[in-house]
Structures are given as C-alpha cells and as structure tokens.
Amino acid sequence: MSPLSEVEQDLRVIRQWQPRARRVYLTGANPFVMSYDKLMDIALLLRKYLPHMESFGMFARVTDIAPKSVEELKNLRHMKLDNLNIGMETAHDPTLERMNKGYHAADILEQLSKLDAAGIRYNVVYLNGLGGKGMGEASAVASAEVLNQLHPWIINIVSLTVFPEAPLYQEVLNGTYEEEPEVERLLEMRTFISRLAIKTNILANHVSNPVPLTGALPNDQAVILRELDRAIEHLPESELRGYRVRVRGL
C-alpha cells in the first residue's frame, strides 16, 4: 500500500484539478484490507483536501471486513465511507473451498451484516459459472439464500472466463476442472435471480455475459426472468460459446 505521504501528495494534485470533487474511489486491488487506523487517516486527508466530498468507496474482500468492529465501521461511515464493492463470488461452500477463497457462507453473512449495521452501502459480485459443470444450481441457491438475509445495493453478475494465463486454465486442460456450459450458466443465473427476495439492483451487463441484463428487484424480476427464458430457449450452446472465446479481456 502507498505510504500516507504519497496519498497526501496525490490529494494535493487532485485538489488542483478537481477541488469540488464529490465522489472519491480508492483504487489498487482491495484497499479495504488496510487497517481501521490507516483508513481513518486517509479519510481525514480526504476531508482536508476535498471538503466537498460526499462519499468515498473502494474494493473489498469479505475477509477485509473481519478485523473491523461495527463501531469502527460506523466511524468510517461517519467519515463518509459509503460504497464498498465486495467480491463475494458465491456463497456455495464447496465452490469457495475448491477455489481457496478463504471464507465460507457463514463468513459472508456475518461480515456483510456488520456493514448493514454500520449503515455502509455495498455492492456484491456474483461470479456465474465459478463452480464448474453441474454446480451452478447449488451455487445459485446457496448464494440467494445468504443474500436474502442482507441488503446489497447492487448485485453485479459476471461470468467466469478462463484465460490461458490463469492457473485454472491448466486445470481445464488436464481435466481436473470442467467449465460450466453456457446454457447451464443461463439456467444458473435464472435460478439465482428467481430466488432473490430482497430489494436490490441487478447489473448483469458485463462483457463476460453474452446475454446482458439489468433491472431493479423486485419490480423488474419477472421481466429479467422472461429475457433469460427466451435466451435459454433460442440461443444454441455453440453461439454462446463462440461469444465466450471471443472475449479477450475483462
């Protein structure tokens, strides 16, 4: 992580060009891994150099929340932290273990509940297809069950795309991991969205999704499901797979 002096130097430059900035996003992997004290130091600098700032956010892992108490999270919220993007990926324990994520469904529920208690708005990422062939239904059901006990502002749905430089690619080649077929992924997404019973927003328009979808739940739930039903019925596996192999970067 950058030393505090470097952060302050960057903020001096930002103040020159955007003195009335209202939204700030801390970049570089998952900055929320920083300690509470360092995050508070940065928040104080943000307030000093960007007095018009209304909120700041960053990427986070589920495990980044664990060392921080609800009281500390409330203090960060008071300093205008209000947008965490959390790479949940799934709440299906066998898949989390298979991918060495370092947490389980119970951890997701415990840690994100702390954000709810602190009043911090957050988004989660659901990685469609992560479990591989035959695991989509279980992943969708388990993930919806956990999220129905939480209050994510946005659920970003992206689809696993394995590139040659990824370690998982070697597992695909040697047969120890089999990618979920494309139609099965659409069925997984349908199950996931159909089981969500909370007020939230769905963003499934990432380049990794051959069938882009967006909407607000519960109002748009039926419309989204109809779109998925049409895609499942009319789009052949070969066409969907062709889209996947043409994706060169995320």
Regions inferred by a protein language model and the residue ranges of each:
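Hydrophobic anchor at the start of a short beta-strand
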Residues: 56, 122, 200
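Conserved strand-turn element in the central/C-terminal portion of the radical SAM core barrel
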Residues: 63, 91-95, 115-139, 158-164, ...
